From Swiss-Prot:
A Pfam family recorded for this sequence: AstB
Annotated protein name in UniProt: N-succinylarginine dihydrolase
Gene3D superfamilies given in the database record: Succinylarginine dihydrolase
Species: Burkholderia pseudomallei (strain 668)
Organism classification: Bacteria, Pseudomonadati, Pseudomonadota, Betaproteobacteria, Burkholderiales
Subunit structure: Homodimer.
Length: 446
């Protein structure tokens, strides 16, 4: 059946700020306590969505979550009226207010793991929201993520939206940032590729400086839950030393699409065995794997982390070639820029590179790939998606005006104590649910 890959980007929320909450994320820590521009952040992401939609790619949008999370703050013992809760948290535990105010749900690569209907046991598209249990500010996302996905992909005959895995370190799950899918055609059965940082119950190498957020056990549980065929499911371990170098998700060191894997030579433990396993599984489906392995002598791991070369989108064009969507930091790094020029000049599958300004997201450690959740849909499934979430001229104009109306152009960590920010955010989100036709999505609307 005819199918295409759709990208659902997270719309940056009104509380976008730099609180330095993500240990292991070099950009997040290095920009801690600097001023953010929520309006610019949201517009940068929206313009990427619109330009890709204009190029003919299926592009959807996912709304921000309600922040600050009064639910979290109340669960942590802060009481009183909403303004009192925020004031007490700001005075007694500003780090908890920062966690409750994070706009990190914008990085929808961590929202869920998605398996298309061609791969699953019941021929439905399966979504498992990521529990993100390694970080407090992200561990509060999964219930709202489930609610949002269930509203957009509401047809239970075609879509299965699961709860997150139990939030224990043994089942630490970071979603699609550690998952990709290889296939000959999107509508044909494919090979699903899960990358983990450590195993809870198997002895093996682990990072020593930064935590490994994804476990083998979580990846395997998602595969079982989605009913994936064992012979078409491959697991690989990310190299611990690159996690310690700031590669906190696999999508900072590798990206794949269709029959192509684009990765750094130090991405995986025993990389040749990984390539061989993928090639064998894909070969059994009648497709040939293309591996573009970037040598460390051309682009170091430090260059990859600094530029986010691999946190790019690899998109299939109608002529069968692929296009790489990268942040502008790739052009500002001489080694990476030279590599990209040589890559496009070659005769490989990647023939075009598009550069985007995503500076506000990048300063928190999120590039083009972080901002999108890939969902392969056939024609009938796409028709069943809530229609108002697809980016086109009208929705772009509505969202652009909505951002202008509701977003601040400067936000520092101390501004999170402003009770007006909660009111501004709720007013904005209430209007957004009407624009997107999603009903009463948020706690404050219920």
């Amino acid at each position: 059946m005819n199918a295409k890959e759709a990208n659902f980007d997270g719309l940056v929320g009104p509380t976008h700020n730099y609180a330095g909450l993500s240990f292991g994320n070099v950009a997040s820590l290095s920009n801690e306590k600097s001023d953010a521009n929520p309006k610019a952040a949201a517009k940068q992401g929206l313009r990427k969505m619109k330009q890709l939609a204009d190029l003919g790619f299926a592009q959807g949008v996912l709304p921000p979550q309600e922040r600050p999370s009064l639910r979290l703050l109340r669960e942590l013992g802060f009481s009183g009226k909403d303004a009192d809760v925020i004031a007490k948290a700001a005075r007694q535990a500003p780090e908890l207010l920062a966690a409750a105010s994070s706009a990190s749900a914008m990085w929808t690569a961590n929202a869920a793991t998605v398996s298309p209907s061609a791969d699953t046991g019941d021929a439905r598209v399966h979504f498992t929201p990521a529990n993100l249990c390694s970080k407090l500010h992200r561990a509060i996302e999964h219930e709202s993520t489930r609610r949002t996905l269930a509203a957009i992909f509401a047809d239970e005959a075609r879509f299965a939206v699961h709860d997150a895995l139990p939030g224990t370190p043994a089942l630490g799950d970071e979603g699609a940032a550690n998952h990709t899918r290889f296939c000959a055609e999107y509508g044909a059965p494919g090979v699903e590729f899960f990358v983990y940082g450590r195993a809870e119950y198997r002895r093996g190498p682990e990072p020593t400086r930064f935590p490994a957020r994804q476990t083998f056990e979580a990846s395997r549980a998602v595969a079982h839950r989605h009913g994936l065929r064992e012979e078409a499911t491959i697991y690989a371990q990310q190299r611990p030393d690159v996690i310690d170098a700031g590669v906190f998700h696999n999508d900072v060191i590798a990206v794949g699409n269709r029959d192509t894997l684009f990765c750094h030579e130090h991405a995986f433990v025993d990389p040749q065995a990984v390539y061989d396993a993928l090639a064998a599984s894909l070969g059994a489906l009648g497709a040939q794997l293309n591996v573009i392995e970037v040598p460390d002598r051309a682009v170091s791991v430090a260059d990859a982390v600094g530029s986010y070369l691999f946190n790019s989108q690899l998109l299939a064009r109608e002529d069968g070639t692929q296009m790489l969507v990268v942040p502008q930091e790739c052009r500002e790094n001489a080694n990476v820029a030279a590599y990209l020029d040589a890559l496009v000049a070659g005769n490989g599958p990647i023939r075009d590179v598009r550069v985007f300004d995503l500076r506000e997201s990048m300063k928190n450690g999120g590039g083009p790939a972080c901002l999108r959740l890939r969902v392969v849909l056939n024609d009938a499934e796409r028709a069943a998606v809530k229609p108002n979430v697809w980016i086109g001229d009208a929705l772009f104009a509505s969202l652009d005006a909505w951002i202008d109306k509701h977003y601040r152009d400067r936000l520092s960590p101390v501004d999170l104590a402003d009770p007006a920010l909660l009111d501004e955010s709720r007013t904005a989100l209430d209007e957004l649910t009407q624009i997107l036709g999603l009903g009463s999505l948020y706690d404050f609307q219920r």
